[in-house]
Amino acid sequence: MGKEADSKIRDFIGKVRKKYNINKAILFGSRARLDHFKNSDYDVILVSPNFRGIFFSERIAKMYDFWNHYPLEIEPLCYTPEEFKRKLKEHGIIRQAVREGIEI
């Protein structure tokens, strides 16, 4: 991960971690593999107990509110700890993200 990208995603994670009690944040995809293009998006999994009772789409919208001042796109996946545990068993992309991603 380049220094500029590193600071952007770490700044973002720091802000949402404080607001939503994020207990797991994983950068995955091309940014984590270091095979991204200049304008590639940031794929990130965020896990928080504070997401309970919030619709999945609303969680994502809330993350965009934190990201909107950065010039690049983000693709957040926001789960409760229980959802994350279940998705880890059900979805290959989540397993791959955990295996190949960078926990921040």
PLM region descriptions:
Residues 43-47:
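Short beta-strand->loop micro-motif that forms the acidic, two-metal-ion catalytic signature
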